[in-house]
From Swiss-Prot:
InterPro entries in the cross-refs: AspA/AstE_fam, AstE_AspA_cat, Aste_AspA_hybrid_dom, SuccinylGlu_desuccinylase
Described purpose of this protein according to its UniProt entry: Transforms N(2)-succinylglutamate into succinate and glutamate.
Pfam families the UniProt entry points to: AstE_AspA_cat, AstE_AspA_hybrid
Protein name as annotated: Succinylglutamate desuccinylase
Gene: astE
Lineage: Bacteria, Pseudomonadati, Pseudomonadota, Gammaproteobacteria, Moraxellales
Amino acid sequence: MQDFLALTLQGEQPATREGKQANFSWRWLGEGLLECTPHAQYDKAVVLSAGVHGNETAPIELLSHLCTDLFAGRLKLAVRLLLVLGNPYAMRQGKRYVHDDVNRMFCGGYKNLPVTEESKRAEVLEQTVATFFQESSSQAKRYHYDLHTAIRASLLPTFALFPYQTHSYDADLTASLEAADLDALVYHNAVGKTFTHFTSENFKAASATLELGKALPFGQNDLSQFASIDEVIRNVVSEQALPVRNKPKIRVFQVSDSLIKKDEEFHMNLSAEAPNFSTFTKGEIIATQPSGNYVVEQDQVWILFPNPNVKIGLRAGLVLTETI
């Protein structure tokens, strides 16, 4: 198997589309889609995805190195694994997305958008993941780690978002995120159209979206900054014990509200460079628009993903409260 990332960026296929290694079989399922199944019995089916936003290159490079080490025998595969490079079309152009945000297209969201390379890709990703989980052992627990980097700086540099779900959250997933030295966990309060909501809702996978620092071009990442999460995902796929957490106790937040842009004249009381987890206190105005201002009712809230430039009707930010 040739270089997974290089093939994807070049839009090429490997010389052979399937093969066997010392302890696993593999299949190239299409552009940026690689399935690996251990010869031995397994009890987990794991999706590792990156590049759903094409310019978030560090996680893409982490998955590429992990793949290389699996094929070189430096890392032993103990789970059934699907590696996903989400948006090759945008990756080649160094853009977050070209037409529309792929991470708002899942759970059938692509059906409400014009047909583009990216909407077609979202459909392919849904179908590929569905087949992967359906063809995995019925006894295998299902996991999905979707790796991202953020557009803006963050007062809590690394964090994970759990999709809203009615079934209980998986303790092993949470333990792995704590071991990865993440700074915070954020629990969504409503259904969404993200990749992880799709896998959680439809396949009861233990799913999380990981935000791991700043987006930089290929080759400019200091991957040593991602050593903790890299170690954890390698331990997950090889079923090794998780490392000990080296940071203070992880902070936990709940989404309490979404800031929806209802009018063209929409302003947020944050600078353009304001980091994620910026705070507001009771009585302060977070956003103004003719249809009504957003005034803080709680003692303190934190703002995540503020973006006043979204289209009307879309979310311009998340309002969080901290769970003590």
